[in-house]
Structure formats: C-alpha cells, structure tokens
Amino acid sequence: MKTTTDFLKMKAAGEKIVMVTAYDYPAAKFAEAANVDMILVGDSLGMVVLGYDSTMPVTVADMIHHAKATRRGAKDTFVVVDMPFGSYHGDVNETLKTAIYMMQETGADALKVEGAGDIIPVIQKLTTAGIPVVAHLGLLPQSAGVLGGYKVQGKTAEQATKLIEDAKQCEEAGACAVVLECIPHQLTEIVSAHLIIPTIGIGAGVEADGQVLVYHDMLSYGSHHVPKFVQQFANMGKEASEGMVRYVEAVKAGTFPAQKHFFTMKEDALDQLYGGVQS
C-alpha cells in the first residue's frame, strides 16, 4: 500500500496520482484490481448512491457504513474518507473525537475536509493527533448553496489569489494533499507549483499532480447528469438497463429459469415424498 510519503515522491518525480471514488465492496475491488493509487469514499455517495439532491444529508454513520465496505474490498489501497457536513464545523475537540471514531471504525488511511479559513485549525488538530488529512478547495459541494451553486471557482484574480493562499495554509497546517475542484487549469498549475504536497484535480485540468473522478460518473452507472469535466470510460448503466429488461422478458416468457438452472431430487426421494404415489 502506498503512503503519504509515496505520494510526495510521486509528485516530485512527476508521476501522476490516480484517485477514484468507491462506496462499496465491489467498486473497491474493481479499483484495487486496476491499481489506482487512492480511493476516496466521498460524501458524494449521498447523491449517486442514496439519491439525495446534495451531500448535506449524509451522516457520519452513512460514511462509516460505506467506508467499512470499501475497506474490505480494498485492503491494500490508500483509502480517504470524507468527513460529512456538520461533523467538523463546531468545537475542534469534538471534531477530533469524531475523526478518531471514524478512523477506528473504518480503517481509513486519511480523512478529507472541505475549505480553509475556519477549517485550518481543524486540519492542525487532526494532523497533530496523527490523522492524515486531505484538504479540498475550489468548488466545495458541502457549501454549494453559499457559493451560488455548482460553479467554477477562482476565475477572478482576487479569487485565485485567495485560493493560492488557502492552499498554502492547508499545507502549513499539515494536510498531506489537496483536492482542487472546478477551478481554471491555469490556477491549478500555479497552486501545484507552490505546494510540496500533491494536488488532486477534479475539473481542474491536467496540471494537477493527480486526478479523481466519481465512480458512477466515469462508468456511466446510474448518473443522470454528467459534468463537463468527466470522461466516461465505460457504459455500465446501458449494460445494466438492457440486462434488466432481458431478465423481465425472460421471466414473463417462461424461458428463465431454464433446466440448467434447476436443482433436482432423486426419484427415490420423490417416491418417499408422495408415499410411493405420484399425482
């Protein structure tokens, strides 16, 4: 399994870091078999798995449930788990208790939090306690309402300057990596150059030190809206939909189950069942 030190070395060597989300055992198995470098159990599961309109309803219990399944499917991959909305915005000592609980319950290798500013003390508190933290800047899904929706961030010089400073503060606070979401690719290049820790982009251009995509988006699996920055590398949704239709048709037509799917009793057992007389 790779470690935070390995990711620093990969950045220094110019080797791209591959991260993908996973929320359950089979997805994690696929990801590990493909040799991804990191798996993110994101609170995006609220939208792509649980059917919510945003990530805000996702709870700590939700994250632990899905992270446990993911960890079982990817025992040898670096797993990052999101701290959900509201779990790290209050007293830092309470946040630390929650973070420790999540780490112990899930077997995660790191936790991820969104934002800078008031979140910097959280990053410091967790990393001082020995919990690796991945920061998240740019578009912050948990704060999308405050940001005016799911829009590109850092497009003005003022916004870009603030994001660069926020990234530096996250690194100084002890973050082991930073996710950059939906920012101009030129800004990604600048931020990446200013940091020792790796940047992981999502909708942030090729200049990031690594990339992350949502499993369901990249495989077209149940996603009704695909963002501009996503490339679909397979069409699982189409295959699943067509397979479901074929199943319904086969059952209705009486062609499933076929004889090869049957289990059979021996004749003497049948005789005993019917008392030697079969109708």
From Swiss-Prot:
Catalyzes the reversible reaction in which hydroxymethyl group from 5,10-methylenetetrahydrofolate is transferred onto alpha-ketoisovalerate to form ketopantoate. Homodecamer; pentamer of dimers. Belongs to the PanB family. It holds the Pfam family Pantoate_transf. This is 3-methyl-2-oxobutanoate hydroxymethyltransferase. The active site is at residue 181. It catalyses: 3-methyl-2-oxobutanoate + (6R)-5,10-methylene-5,6,7,8-tetrahydrofolate + H2O = 2-dehydropantoate + (6S)-5,6,7,8-tetrahydrofolate. The keyword Transferase applies. Mg(2+) binds at residues 43, 82, 114. Its cofactor is Mg(2+). One of its GO terms (molecular function) is magnesium ion binding. It is found in: Cytoplasm. Keywords: Cytoplasm, Magnesium, Metal-binding, Pantothenate biosynthesis, Transferase. Its EC number is 2.1.2.11. The gene is panB. InterPro entries: Pantoate_hydroxy_MeTrfase, Pyrv/PenolPyrv_kinase-like_dom, Pyrv_kinase-like_dom_sf. Gene3D superfamilies: Phosphoenolpyruvate-binding domains. Its main location: cytoplasm. One of its GO terms (biological process) is pantothenate biosynthetic process. Pathway: Cofactor biosynthesis; (R)-pantothenate biosynthesis; (R)-pantoate from 3-methyl-2-oxobutanoate: step 1/2.
